[in-house]
Every structure is written in structure tokens, then in C-alpha cells.
Amino acid sequence: MKQSKKQGILERFYYSSDEIIEKPFNWAQMWRLLSYVKPYRKTILPLSFLTVLIGTAVKLVIPILIGVYVLDQAITARNSELLIQLILIISGLYILNYAANVLRIRWMNQLGQHVIYDLRQHLFTHVQRLSHRFFDQRSAGSILVRIMNDINSLQELFTSGVINLLTDLLLLAGVIIILFTLSPELTIAIMVTLPIMFFISTSLRKKIRRSWQTVRLKQSKLNSHLNESIQGIRVTQAFTQEEENMAYFDGVNQENYQSWREATRKNAMFRPLVEMTNAIGTAVLIWYGATLIMNETITIGVFVSFAFYLGMFWEPISRLGQVYNQLLMGMASSERIFEFLDEQPNVKEKPDAIHKKKINGEISFEEVEFSYDEKRKALHAVSFSIPAGSTLALVGHTGSGKTTIANLISRFYDATGGTIKIDGVPIQNLSLASLRSQISIVLQDTFIFSGSIMENILFGRPDASEEEVMKAAQAVGADEFISGLAEGYQTEVEERGSVLSAGQRQLISFARALLADPAIIILDEATASIDTETEVKIQRALKTLLKGRTAVMIAHRLSTIRDADRIIVLDHGKKMEEGKHEQLLAKGGIYAGLVKAQYSTG
């Protein structure tokens, strides 16, 4: 029974957007990733490549100097002068190689940091421009994973992975050329095991790739739950669901652990394969090389050089397992990053969109329909008009379509049918910036950012002066409680304003909206979470706030909309009634029933 309950907990969430992305490795994607290096192709990048070339050249020269020149010429001829010269040259080359490696690491780290900064900035900027539907389909945790974890996993790829791959490929090419130059038959003999290793490693490739994709998926799920648990800790504790929450965390943490374990297990199979092949190659070198020496086909110096080069040959191949691991992790992360970057806003701005510096605020809905998905229709042919400067109240049960109308006015979504106009202009013809900059929205659960109260109010208009901020706060009655704080307007508040009461947070949001000086104000259940005393203050402030502005009020407390110019009653996305407060009461319909029910329970 306990197991089945835990299994049910583990199935609590499912994020369809975080499924494993199954795409074969392709160079087009790799080139797209490397395109972020282009801004540095004339500075850090060529310097890094230069150090790679110098380091590789030094490594390739030293075995020849030791084997062919030191052993076969200096020592065999007992030429001490030549030996000293060669020792000095080899020592100098080692110093040069050290300097090249230091500079390579330094410049590649700089390049990697630049690329990661640019990529994260690009992704965050792109996500900021995506439509609300994108965020409806994804958890905050899964988005955070891609912006932070997935991009971080690319850091090692750029700082060492790509350059190591280039270095190893150059080294392998150089070693193979030199080996064939020294002795083609010995080279062929020691490489007989390569096809076997290539066949086995190719079969492992897809499995290793998929395992790292699974790791990314499980990390996303784990981070999503952590983010949700922290945000909802009060609800968890209020309902004493700590044990259930910990059980779920144990499940996703176990899944994450198992995915890492499986990925490292499969990846660990590669290095022993290389070492086994290296051992076979070394055995062939000793046996066949000794035969060639005894036949005087090659010298001892060439044999020693071969031994050096054989180590240099298998060393990068062995490292290729680690580099390939970095590459696979990078590709898995880049697929997820590019999936976000390829997302297009559902709400698109026309190239010739009109940028109106000032709108009057007249709003009209003409047979407007909207669906959040194919199964759920939120609005059914809704029509109404709001003259500029007037107040419209929307009333109805939860799910009746009130918030949907507010979202459509702000163009967070596009209507699936009908036309919405602002000042007689179809809303799609207006630029998003000019439209949204002249609309202020105050929500029931207002968001307070980490920072000072001054900064939170300034969010409505960042270029406003401190005096203007204080005037806005005074107008909505927020100045009274702000001035009573130890630091006043410079008081630091935590994320979501947890140190403030619901009423205080709402007053700050009103001040923020007033400071923005919008033509249209949308109040979405804005007075639902405040006490009666605070509501009286806000009702006074609203008269100042709404004066000369178009207002759309989504009402929970029907007492707050008595003075609205017009009230529309919605039910399951349909407009059922329309009129003033007194008219609708006299009609004795849905609105009258809602008022009666609220007063009888209040």
C-alpha cells in the first residue's frame, strides 16, 4: 500500500516539454553552437589556435630528437658536443611547450567565459520575449535548469572540450604521418586493432548519448520540484504534507542518481577499451619491432621513437572518451537550449505595427472567441465596448472568462476569433511596446521583487524621480505605512514581499500602477485579499487612479463595483447580462443572485 502511494506521488507531475529530445548528432548543430565563438575570431580564438599549433609541433618533434638524433647519432657516435646541444634544444622545447599550455588554458578559459555569458544573455533575452502560452506549458524550475544548468554544462566544452578535440586530432594526424614515414609496415602492424575498437565504440555512442540526455531530463525534474517546494512551503506545512513532499523528492532524487550512475557506467566502458587496445598494440610493437631491429630494417632509435609515438597515439584516443563525454553532454544541453531559442512567440508583432505614443483608451470586442487549447473554449463570441475614460466591471464565477478578457486586452494571448480594437484600431496593428506601456495591471496576488520599496514602485516607470514616487504612494495611501518603516522607501523587501502584509503589497502595486500613468488600468481581483479598513483607503485612491482613464475591473467583492459605468456578467465564456448595478439588480437575473448570495454570507 505504501509503495503504491509513493508511486502515485511520483506520477504527480508530468512536463511534456521536458521529454528527451531524440536527434542524431549533426555538424549543423555543432556549427550553430560554435557560432557563439565568432565575435572572438579575431582576438582570443587565433591566439588559442596558435598555442595549440606550437604545443602540438613541440610534442611531435621531441620523440624524433630523442630517438633518431640522441640515440642513433649522438650516443652511437659518442658525440658529447652534439648530445649537449640536443639536451639544450629538448629542454628549450619543453619550456616552450609549458608556456604554450599556460597561455592556451588562460585564453580558452577567457573564451569559454565570454561564450557562456553571451549564450546565457541571448537565451534569457529570448525567453523574456516569449508569449504567456510558453510559460503556461513549462514549470519555472525547468526553465531555470536550461538557463543555468544546461548552459553551465557547455562551459567545460568551450573551455577545454573543443580545443582538446582539435589538439588531439592534430596530434593524431601528425603521429600517423610520422609513423608511416619512419616504418610503414610497423605502423600497419600496431594498428590492426583499430577497426575492432572503432566498431565497439560506435555501438556505444548512441547509448552514451541517450544516457546523458536522460541525466538532463532528470535534473530538470528535480529542479522543478525544488523550485515548487520552496515556493509552496507554507501550503505544504499548513496541510502537514512534509512527509509526502519528502517522499516525492526522494523519488525524483533517486531517479536523478540512477540516471547519473547509468551514464557514468556506460561512459566508463570506453577507457578500458582503449587501454586494452593500447596493450595489444604495445605487444605487437615489441614483437614485430624487435624482429625489424634484428633484421636491421629499423634502428634502435627509430624503435624508441615508435614507442614514444605509440604512447602519444593512444593518449589522445584515451582522452577522446572524456572529450566525447563532454561533447555528448554539450550536445544534449545545446539541444534543450536551442529548443527554447527556436520557440517563437505566439503573439507576434507586425513589421509595420503602429507605435502610438498616446492612446485614449477606447476598447471594443467584436464577436471575440478564445481557446487555451482544442478542448477548452474560454470565450464564445463576446462583444462589448468601453468608451475612453469609463469603467467596466466583469463579474462571474471562477472560469467564466473574466481574466481571459484582461489577458486579451493586454495581448498576452491573441483571440482565436473576432476582433479587439483599441481606439478603433485592431489590436494586432499596434506595436506591443506602445500597447503594453499604456496598460497597467494590478493582480490579486501582486508580485513584489527583491529590493527596496522605492525600486518596486519605480518598476512602473524607471525614469521617475523620487518625488514622483512619493506622490504616487501618497495618492493611494501607501505613504502612511512606508513612512512608518525604519528605512522608509529604502526598506529592503524579500522576494514576493513576504515581510509585508497582503494589503501593504497591494498598496505598493497601486502606487506602481499610478506612477506608470497608463491610459488603461486592469484590476484583476485587486481588492480580494485586503481587509475592510484597507479597502476603504484603496476605494478613495481608486477614484484618483481611475480619473480620466479606462478601467476594467474583475470583481470578487461586488460592493467595489457599484459605481462602475457598466457591468458585464459572464458565465462559461458567454456574456449573459450587461448594464449598471441598479439595472441588473432590478432585472433579477444572475447578477442579482450573486449580490444576494454574497450579502447573505458576508
Q: Can you describe what each PLM-predicted range is?
A:
Residues P46, V58-I62, L88, A100, ...:
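Hydrophobic alpha-helical transmembrane segments of ABC transporter permease domains
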Residues L34, P39-K42, H132-R133, N149-F158, ...:
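An intracellular "coupling" helix at the cytosolic face of ABC transporter transmembrane type-1 domains
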Residues N79-E81, Q85-L88, I178-V192, E262, ...:
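Helix-loop-helix
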Residues Q29, V37, R104, M108-G112, ...:
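Juxtamembrane loop-to-helix connectors within ABC transporter transmembrane domains
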Residues M1-V58, A74-L86, R104-M108, G112, ...:
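Membrane-integrated ABC transporters
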Residues E349, K356-G602:
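ABC-type nucleotide-binding domain
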